[in-house]
UniProtKB/Swiss-Prot annotation:
The lineage of its organism: Eukaryota, Viridiplantae, Streptophyta, Embryophyta, Tracheophyta. Its main location: cytoplasm. HAMAP family: Ribosomal_uL18_A (MF_01337_A). It comes from Cucumis sativus (Cucumber). Component of the ribosome, a large ribonucleoprotein complex responsible for the synthesis of proteins in the cell. The small ribosomal subunit (SSU) binds messenger RNAs (mRNAs) and translates the encoded message by selecting cognate aminoacyl-transfer RNA (tRNA) molecules. The large subunit (LSU) contains the ribosomal catalytic site termed the peptidyl transferase center (PTC), which catalyzes the formation of peptide bonds, thereby polymerizing the amino acids delivered by tRNAs into a polypeptide chain. This is Large ribosomal subunit protein uL18.
Length: 302
């Protein structure tokens, strides 16, 4: 059979339906989103929260978001660039920093809802899988993990943030199969390996390797660590202090930046309909009063 080119007729273009904008841009997986935001119909106006984690080259963002007709509403958010306030000034995009960011968000949202005393979570980060138990008074805060468009590979930083949120006291349905240290052959999580990743042990091991094998690369690759005076043996203690500082005060600090100055306008401001109407009335009143004044002057002359 000969190859026949598909002809796009007028009927094809008349019936063509354009996909959603964020699908065309490759930003949203609507098949996953609709399953994350659809709420049970007998729950009426109850929001369905998502634990959203996004990573970039210099930052890790974790947010608690609910969907509405007008758009997504952010209940709370935490960023890895906030971690210097808690004592972590380097390595803000690795697995350990993702854990700290998830922990910060969990403690922040529970503090906001006045549930931080009831749900302390897993204070000692042992690397074991942890799920929060319901208290007698209020149920734990529940959210669903939203990973976006990333590949959900074992040991991804998104699951580091998930582990931090779980240890922080949030109720998030999950499996331990994607945490760092899960062995596919043994079908179980290696707790020691996972704990090593939570406390930056993989970074410390790489630092030691470079110091022995490639000192020049170590000087350039870990220049910020060297500048801050942080050594490989100090990383675990550093992360323990950061976790304690986050639990002590998770509230977001307001920025010290001054308010932007109001710029001088050189073009005329466009008036609204009511302002134009009021301005016309003023001009008419002024003209009428001027006309009345001229009439009075004429009468005086006569």
């Amino acid at each position: 059979m000969a190859f026949a080119k598909a002809q796009k007729t007028k009927a094809y273009f008349k019936r063509y339906q354009v996909k959603f904008k964020r699908r065309r841009e490759g930003k949203t997986d609507y098949r996953a989103r609709i399953r994350l935001i659809n709420q049970d119909k007998n729950k009426y106006n109850t929001p369905k929260y998502r634990f959203v984690v996004r990573t970039s080259n210099k930052d890790i963002t974790a947010q608690i978001i609910s969907a509405s007709i007008a758009g997504d509403l952010v209940l709370a958010s935490a960023y890895s660039h906030e971690l210097p306030q808690y004592g972590l000034e380097v390595g803000l995009t690795n697995y350990a920093a993702a854990y700290c960011t998830g922990l910060l968000l969990a403690r922040r949202v529970l503090k906001m809802l006045e549930m931080d005393a009831e749900y302390e979570g897993n204070v000692e980060a042992t690397g074991e899988d942890y799920s929060v138990e319901p208290a007698d008074t209020r149920r734990p805060f529940r959210a669903l993990l939203d990973v976006g468009l990333i590949r959900t590979t074992t040991g991804n930083r998104v699951f580091g943030a998930l582990k931090g949120a779980l240890d922080g006291g949030l109720d998030i349905p999950h499996s331990d199969k994607r945490f760092a240290g899960y062995a596919k052959n043994g079908q179980q999580l290696d707790v020691e390996v996972h704990r090593k990743y939570i406390f930056g042990g993989h970074v410390a091991a790489y630092m030691r390797t470079l110091m022995e094998d490639e000192p020049e690369k170590y000087q350039s690759h870990f220049s910020e660590y060297i500048k801050k005076g942080i050594e490989a043996d100090e990383l675990e203690g550093l992360y323990k202090k950061v976790h304690a500082a986050i639990r002590a005060n998770p509230i977001a600090k307001k920025s010290d930046k001054p308010q932007p100055k109001a710029h001088k306008r050189y073009n005329l401001k466009k008036l609204t309909y009511d302002e134009r109407k009021a301005r016309l009335v003023e001009r008419l009143n002024a003209l009428n009063s001027a006309a009345d004044g001229d009439d009075d002057d004429d009468e005086d002359d006569e």
